[in-house]
From Swiss-Prot:
The keyword 4Fe-4S applies. GO terms for molecular function: 4 iron, 4 sulfur cluster binding; 4-hydroxy-3-methylbut-2-en-1-yl diphosphate synthase activity (ferredoxin); 4-hydroxy-3-methylbut-2-enyl-diphosphate synthase activity (flavodoxin); iron ion binding. The lineage of its organism: Bacteria, Fusobacteriati, Fusobacteriota, Fusobacteriia, Fusobacteriales. This is 4-hydroxy-3-methylbut-2-en-1-yl diphosphate synthase (flavodoxin). It comes from Fusobacterium nucleatum subsp. nucleatum (strain ATCC 25586 / DSM 15643 / BCRC 10681 / CIP 101130 / JCM 8532 / KCTC 2640 / LMG 13131 / VPI 4355). Its cofactor is [4Fe-4S] cluster.
Length: 354
């Protein structure tokens, strides 16, 4: 199933429609610290981030946007809570997109002022609903955060922005409860055609957060829901990008990146397959080319079981084989497996250039 969402422009990016899914992250620096924030944004860009959000929690942070913009090339999103005037200041200083939280931005009149300023500069707004900060009235109606509460909050503010003749809208409905988050996105995707920003909020540390994000975001992407995403981890933001890229890669939603498949090992394994798989992953981790490598621990069954891989190695004690698309190419010594694999792939890629 595919959703045909409308397209919203954020600086030079197009989000929605048939455009590729955009990967986002968020800085964890003091936004007023220009040097530290610029350094982190540029590090995020190096690993594949395409859009960066930064908290604008005071006047100094809002004023820093102008200087930060001079030193980075990625579009920037201002994360606004409580004080609508900070949104106005962020717009004045050249922000590319706003994220407002309906639960704490204030009165409709405040929202109108933000919308008018954003419209004048062609700046899109993400309505970022969060299960932890749903409006008091809606929370009282439902008794606790739930799917319907998230959707009602989002729909109210979508209609409010539309009333002010504003349609450059992106929507998110985040929760730390994966099931609630998935159901909320599915429901709103049937109600509006605005691009959806996917994410599990407060997902947790690297391991748990990766699992929760892969399940929540992945389930929606399989349904054809989602136009941009952020994996939230209690970790260096660079790790968020690595996980996000992997999610897109395994769902065949990315045009680049090497996918490594490897067997889980069993009693037939006679080499350090875990170490070998990690070596292969590290060697090809940064490659832009799109292909699949199999690392198998059994020379008898390995090539056949990994037939869908473009390239592969299978190893026994002291000896291994190289294979392509399940067909054995040659036998090599165990110690030369990685080097021979690199050589085979490198030669293939060079031939494709010609």
């Amino acid at each position: 199933m595919e959703r045909n969402t409308r397209v919203v422009k954020v600086a030079n990016l197009k989000i929605g429609g048939n455009n590729p899914i955009i990967i986002q992250s968020m800085t964890n620096t003091n936004s007023a610290d220009v040097e530290a924030t610029v350094k982190q944004i540029n590090n995020l860009e190096k690993v594949g981030c395409q859009l960066v959000r930064m908290t604008i929690n005071n006047i100094k942070a809002a004023e820093a946007i102008k200087e930060i913009k001079k030193k980075v090339s990625l579009p920037l999103v201002a994360d606004i809570h409580f004080d609508y005037r900070l949104a106005l200041l962020a717009i004045k200083n050249g922000i590319d997109k706003l994220r407002i939280n309906p639960g704490n931005i204030g009165s409709d009149e405040n929202v109108k002022k933000v919308v008018e300023a954003a419209k004048e500069k062609n700046i899109p707004i993400r309505i970022g609903v969060n299960s932890g900060s749903i409006e008091k009235e809606i929370l009282e109606k439902y008794g606790k955060p739930c799917v319907d509460a998230l959707v009602e909050s989002a729909m109210y503010h979508i209609r409010l922005l539309e009333k002010f003749d504003f349609f450059d809208i992106i929507v998110s409905l985040k929760s730390s409860n994966v099931k609630m988050m998935v159901e909320a996105y599915r429901k709103i995707s049937s109600l509006v055609d605005y691009p959806l920003h996917l994410g599990v909020t407060e997902a947790g540390t690297k391991f748990q957060g990766t699992v929760k994000s892969a399940i929540g975001i992945g389930a929606l992407l399989v349904d054809g829901i989602g136009d941009t995403l952020r994996v939230s981890l209690t970790e260096n933001p660079v790790e968020e990008i690595k996980v996000a890229k992997e999610i897109l890669k395994v769902l065949d939603l990315s045009d680049e990146g090497v996918e490594i498949i490897s067997c889980p090992t069993c009693g037939r394994t006679e080499i350090d397959l875990i170490g070998l798989a990690k070596q292969v992953e590290e060697e090809f981790r940064t490659k832009k080319n799109k292909f699949k490598i199999a690392v198998m621990g059994c020379v008898v069954n390995g090539p056949g079981e990994a037939r869908e891989a473009d390239y592969g190695i299978a190893a026994g004690r002291g000896i291994g084989i190289l294979f392509k698309k399940g067909e054995i190419i040659k036998k090599v010594s165990e110690s030369n497996l990685l080097e021979e694999l690199k050589k085979m792939i490198s030669e293939d890629l060079e031939n494709k250039k010609d």
